[in-house]
Amino acid sequence: MYCLSEAVIYVNGEFIPKSEAKISVFDEGITHGWAVYEGIRVYEGRILELDAHLNRLYASAKGAGIAIPIEQSEFRRAVLDTVVTNEYRNCHIAPWVGYGELGGEPSVVIRIVERSSRMGEHATSMVSSIRRAAPDSIPAQIKTNSRLDLMLAKIEASLAGVDYAIMLDNVGYVAEASLANIMIVKNGVTLTPYPINALEGVTRNLILRLLPMRGYEAFEDNITLHDLWTCDEAFVCGTGAEVRPIVKVDGRTIGDGETGPVTEKVIQLYTDYIITHGEEVDYSS
């Protein structure tokens, strides 16, 4: 039995109270950031895009040279069991796989925290002085623990008193926000950067699928600073970020400073998708 006053964490096949959960300090995931991870959300007992997240986790691990020691189907069951064990109906789940000690097995950890939704809350931003790592240096499609560029940008945003840092790529185009994808709207058309210097987000891809199904144009494109500063609407999206309108960039008001009509539609489509396509967690199992 577990005391549910604290979260129970999955660690290498066992469920352990958060205060007792541990892995080796010699794990390369800790000593050198040689680890991959995911972020998954549960809303009112519905888990969203679980298989898409696990597909990316296994692809990231392969790209990073980490051999996940369990089959994807077993990992899937472990994620669901983590939710059920904690009895959380609104939460954020973070599967993490570290390379392990040299010569040893990789570590598999599934963290979980209760989290309420911030969907639709206004956010402010700034263009960061930190550039996103070049794709020929650190491939953006590997969701790795070693994301120092993103964290430095996040710190910069925090010190500036804004919610998100918007990072440029090594050429000068908009890449992504700190720990979220970014989309802008110009003349009713939704644009998002190519997934070259930006993570190909699960939420991002979902929005790119949903908008055309409702008659809205949505494309990948190069986005300049001028595009960003002069767009009609902007929003960040991601599993953690959800969908939040960006109402200011570098102190400049985007549109009329309110949630734009396309962004409102995105929030509606995303919320409806959670209800219609979120996988119901069986808490009786």
Where are these regions (language model features)?
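Short beta-strand micro-motifs enriched in acidic
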Residues: 98-100
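Helix-start/capping segments and mature chain N-termini
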Residues: 1-81, 85, 103-285
